Amino acid sequence: MAHPSQLGFQDAASPMMEELLHFHDHALMVVFLISTFVLYIILTMLTTKLTDKLILESHEIEII
């Protein structure tokens, strides 16, 4: 039986509902892993300073 303060699903009453709960848990784990990986890639790209080693001094100003 569900309680007002319960954050999860009710207990499964049938085998089909139990399988749906397992599928839900698995799908959320996959979504969480993909989101974490994308966040890691974004943070890596924002924090990594990509500089060209061939352009030294102030040559980038001359290019503009």
UniProtKB/Swiss-Prot annotation:
UniProt-recorded Gene Ontology molecular function terms: cytochrome-c oxidase activity
Ranges facing Mitochondrial matrix side: 46-64
Cofactor: binding details: Binds a dinuclear copper A center per subunit.
Protein origin, superkingdom: Eukaryota
Cofactor(s) recorded in Swiss-Prot or TrEMBL: Cu cation
Keyword terms: Copper, Electron transport, Membrane, Mitochondrion, Mitochondrion inner membrane, Respiratory chain, Translocase, Transmembrane, Transmembrane helix, Transport
Mitochondrial intermembrane side: 1-14
Catalysed conversion reaction: 4 Fe(II)-[cytochrome c] + O2 + 8 H(+)(in) = 4 Fe(III)-[cytochrome c] + 2 H2O + 4 H(+)(out)
Pfam families reported in the protein's UniProt record: COX2_TM
Family: Belongs to the cytochrome c oxidase subunit 2 family.
Subunit structure: Component of the cytochrome c oxidase (complex IV, CIV), a multisubunit enzyme composed of 14 subunits. The complex is composed of a catalytic core of 3 subunits MT-CO1, MT-CO2 and MT-CO3, encoded in the mitochondrial DNA, and 11 supernumerary subunits COX4I, COX5A, COX5B, COX6A, COX6B, COX6C, COX7A, COX7B, COX7C, COX8 and NDUFA4, which are encoded in the nuclear genome.
Record-given protein name: Cytochrome c oxidase subunit 2
